[in-house]
Amino acid sequence: MGRLSGYRYREIIKILKLFGFEFHRQAAGSHEIWHNPTTKRFTTIPNHSGDMPEGTLRAILKQADIDPEDFIKSK
């Protein structure tokens, strides 16, 4: 399995859009809710500067039901 470190907010959003996710609404603070109308899945994305921690990105992918390998290949 590849590494999920070194991804920034903008890169993650760009890839999530390829998987059909759309911005749904602003959540508390700097967090955003993204939704996939096809799969009816929601995921919460923190909009912070710098690299996303690997554990946080894994949690986002789990919520979105995206395999980490598929995410890495879509880069």
Feature names for model-found ranges:
Residues M1-K75:
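Basic nucleic-acid-binding interfaces
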